[in-house]
């Protein structure tokens, strides 16, 4: 009979104590794996999402992180709005003229280039309005360029594709300004299909629901980004909803009344009247300046009194460095203490059994087993408990992660794969268990090594 078989038989003889000790080790390792997995997924998700296809977000003065959370992750509330005319400062002269002709309204010097247009050559600016909800999901009002110009993916090289339908357009004869594209998670959670109508609620999930709906003309393929949780509507239709006119600018504009666009219009020719420029505001502007102009533009914008420019990558890296990574190390320290206590319990369990095993050890010595053999058996017992508990804990830790997908997917868009190794630190678990098992078995092994044969026969 080899040493491993003897060690296994000894553990079976003390199966209750051995099982409980292994269970405590499994619990500690499961907690370590869970912390590494979830923190790794969150960190990679944040890093991937920060590569959003644009360099800067421009919005009202306030918290830069709040602006990023609201615009990129749809998790916070808008700070304030900026005038639509300010968005047009990023357009060239011909762009301003076309926008003025398309929308109408009051605009000073529409023929001149925008203040920042010289830094935008070859780039783009996309307006975004937020503040409403579609069910539990954020309503994002924007232009068709959101899915036409932006890309996604780890390398920011993947175009947005639709599992069904198409991108919304500025105006269609069938739906007017009231078309929408929904993310994959929105469609799945709300049971939406092409042709369905969605209704935005004002301000909060439980706010007053607007009477005018948006027709779903496209459903995005899953992207693994927050856009899976967005309901994207045509910004032109969004402006026509009640309560979406700039404050203190409610005078007659050629519209019957704020928010007078109603669903019954669909049966006939739809009104092409747009909200004038002076009555419009935007929550954020997504900018991709020309070449290396982002840094210069960010400084210039931040010198103004009412607007700020924020780099999403910089803010997310700051969040990771200040909050996510330190929290991960703190949780790892706590869970590692659980593993250490489990290793001590292995030591105590085997050590307490030594008095009952002195006669067995003496008999084995009398039958020809050397002291080294006895020491090796005790160390093997300790290693088997540590490794068996650790493997069970590893499996449990990876199994618990995906169970949280029911919560993390709808709220954050983060999906946890049960076998994915999210951190290189996880590769040190097995060597660490071997070391802990060896150290835990060292003292009992020394006791066994020194057990006198004659005295215990």
Which residues fall in each region the model found?
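Short, strongly hydrophobic transmembrane alpha-helices
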Residues: 17-41
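Hydrophobic secondary-structure segments that place a key small or acidic residue at a functional site
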Residues: 128-129, 133-145, 153-252
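Hydrophobic, regular-secondary-structure patches
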Residues: 36-149, 274-275, 297-301, 305-308
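Internal alpha-helical transmembrane segments of multipass membrane proteins
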Residues: 23-25, 328-349
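Short helix-loop junctions at transmembrane helix boundaries
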Residues: 391-432, 442-455
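Mechanotransmission and gating elements of multispan inner-membrane complexes involved in transport
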Residues: 94, 117, 208-213, 219-328
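Transmembrane alpha-helical interface segments in multi-pass membrane proteins
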Residues: 338-345, 351-405, 432-436, 444
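A short amphipathic helical element positioned immediately N-terminal to and/or at the very start
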Residues: 3-12
């Amino acid at each position: 009979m080899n040493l491993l078989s003897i060690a296994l038989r000894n553990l079976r003889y003390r199966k209750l104590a051995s099982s409980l000790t292994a269970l405590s080790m499994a619990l500690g390792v499961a907690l370590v794996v869970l912390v590494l997995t979830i923190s790794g997924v969150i960190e990679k998700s944040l890093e991937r999402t920060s590569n959003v296809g644009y360099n800067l977000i421009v919005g009202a003065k306030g918290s830069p992180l709040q602006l990023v959370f609201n615009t990129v992750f749809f998790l916070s509330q808008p700070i304030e709005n900026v005038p639509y005319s300010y968005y047009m400062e990023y357009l060239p002269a011909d762009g301003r003229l076309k926008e003025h002709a398309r929308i109408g309204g009051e605009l000073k010097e529409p023929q001149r280039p925008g203040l920042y247009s010289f830094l935008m050559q070859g780039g783009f600016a996309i307006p975004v309005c937020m503040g409403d909800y579609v069910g539990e999901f954020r309503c994002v009002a924007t232009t068709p360029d959101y899915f036409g110009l932006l890309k996604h993916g780890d390398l920011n090289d993947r175009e947005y594709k639709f599992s069904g339908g198409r991108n919304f357009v500025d105006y269609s004869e069938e739906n007017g300004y009231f078309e929408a594209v929904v993310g994959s998670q929105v469609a799945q959670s709300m049971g939406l299909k092409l042709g369905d109508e969605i209704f935005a609620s004002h301000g909060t999930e439980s706010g007053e629901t607007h009477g005018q709906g948006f027709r779903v003309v496209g459903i995005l393929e899953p992207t693994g980004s927050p856009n899976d949780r967005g309901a994207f509507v045509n910004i032109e239709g969004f402006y026509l909803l009640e309560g979406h006119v700039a404050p203190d600018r409610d005078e007659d504009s050629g519209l019957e009344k704020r928010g007078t666009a109603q669903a019954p219009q669909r049966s006939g020719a739809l009104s092409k009247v747009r909200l004038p420029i002076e009555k419009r505001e935007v929550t954020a502007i997504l900018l991709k300046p020309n070449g290396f102009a982002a840094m210069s533009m960010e400084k210039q914008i931040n010198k103004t009194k009412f607007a700020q420019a924020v780099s999403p990558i910089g803010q997310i890296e700051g969040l990771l460095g200040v909050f996510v990574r330190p929290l991960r190390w703190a949780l790892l320290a706590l869970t590692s203490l659980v593993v250490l206590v489990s290793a001590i319990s292995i030591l105590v369990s085997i050590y307490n059994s030594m008095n009952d095993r002195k006669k067995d050890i003496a008999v084995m010595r009398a039958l020809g087993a050397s002291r080294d053999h006895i020491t090796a058996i005790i160390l093997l017992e300790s290693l088997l408990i540590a490794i068996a508990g650790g493997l069970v804990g590893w499996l449990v830790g990876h199994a618990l992660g995906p169970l949280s997908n029911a919560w993390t997917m709808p709220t954050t868009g983060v999906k946890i794969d049960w076998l994915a190794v999210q951190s290189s630190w996880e590769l040190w678990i097995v060597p660490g268990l071997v070391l802990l098992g060896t150290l835990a078995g060292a003292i009992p092994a020394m006791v066994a090594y020194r057990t006198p044969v004659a005295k215990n026969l």
